């Protein structure tokens, strides 16, 4: 095999591409990883890492390098800051791993993944490389990319292409795969920062859903005293105005108290729910945000992409080594798509619960959650977190 031929090309080197790079290296598969950006994104985005994804990466033996914080629980509070329902992580299935959900600081998370991926001799990692063209002929994929500094172009070949290039996926667009909106768009103001000491409101838990219909807000204590506020963008707001510190501090000072804080980012984001019409075409596969997008209310966007990688790569490894027939790869979409759809629906539903802006609906919500918490306690309030079935799998594909 020449230097321009690979078993797998990975387009995109965010968390999903990083997961692919580590798994490909672990399996000893010759891989090329491309990303337009030279470095990791310096600001936090994803903040949760669940047990399934921790377990999937455990054989790569670098998890201790990822800085994490155990999540003790979430408190849902009404407009008067009285607890509606408190959820602790006790009782939730950990899938035979140490913790059900951990907080992460994504820039450090990315760096740990990338540093480990470098150790595999079968990985060729080219950041600062922009994918320009893709086509597949007789099962061989041809990719053209350029160096973003010199504009020098290169053509490479592979047996498989994994599109981990995000919501605006170049690979998806080049292959004409339609992205269907699920009509769940919402705008939220995100404020990230650091504090020298923990906020008083986090004495027993690590996240608060402030279900105030006047301005729903999520407050999170992350890794090493990082914090995040997600503040609902309301009618009458303007992006320019709400990002001013004197404005957004009106909504968060009551939680910060006397703590000294430093803000690292303020931005208004539109949260989307969408799904690609199909997740593969020939030997080209879409993973992560390239295939599906969901609101962040369950912290499952990045985790769903990492599950995609784990599901697909052991099958590709088996096909390349002659252990399984190629048709096993059809089970990637048939297994993952229904699973992601269910989690997306749950995230949309949870968002609608948190984001009730009508006072009457908020009152009904508060009453229902209090009753549910009283009857069920902490167990299975959100059954989506306690095990999820895949769609039709290998037995269907191998018939």
Regions found by a protein language model. Give the residues of each.
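Conserved hydrophobic helix-helix packing surfaces used for dimerization/oligomerization
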Residues: 8-10, 31, 284
